[in-house]
């Protein structure tokens, strides 16, 4: 799946449909990410400013370190987009998908400074939410009722 702009995201129901894929309104999601980026002080990222030329372009890939359930991609997408409106983002897994270790989840291409400055905020959300989603999936799998094909419904008395 390749999604690069808000209209395409909305058309695919990626995260603007409240309650369906992500329980925040578009306005709330944008405000949450803006607050996280401000808290991270990305506007004063002196390391990136000192080591990366302003016109430098970069490509990067978000890859899962271990198997689990990926979550938080809408937040990562928004973090990268808020710091570089010209960034191209290709979402390669659905939010909520089960992934194996070393699975490519998202590909980015854009200004290196924007990508590097948004990276920590994006990864913090994805790692935290993926951990919660993975643990939840494990609990659901553990308590799921398993029935074989020979189980039949009994008539009620």
What are these regions (language model features)?
Residues 2-157:
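Acidic/glycine-rich phosphate/pyrophosphate-binding loops and surrounding catalytic core
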């Amino acid at each position: 799946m390749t999604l690069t702009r808000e209209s395409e995201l909305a058309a695919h129901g990626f995260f603007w449909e409240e309650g369906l894929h992500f329980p925040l309104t578009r306005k709330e999601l944008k405000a949450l990410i803006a607050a996280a980026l401000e808290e991270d002080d990305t506007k004063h990222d002196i390391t990136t400013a000192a080591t990366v030329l302003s016109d430098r372009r970069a490509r990067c890939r978000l890859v899962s370190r271990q198997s689990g359930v990926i979550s938080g991609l809408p937040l990562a997408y928004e973090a990268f987009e808020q710091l570089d409106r010209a960034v191209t983002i290709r979402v390669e897994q659905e939010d909520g998908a089960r992934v194996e270790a070393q699975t490519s989840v998202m590909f980015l291409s854009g200004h290196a400074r924007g990508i590097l400055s948004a990276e920590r905020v994006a990864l913090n959300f994805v790692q935290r939410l993926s951990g919660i989603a993975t643990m939840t999936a494990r609990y659901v799998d553990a308590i799921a009722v398993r029935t074989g094909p020979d189980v039949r419904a009994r008539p009620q008395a």
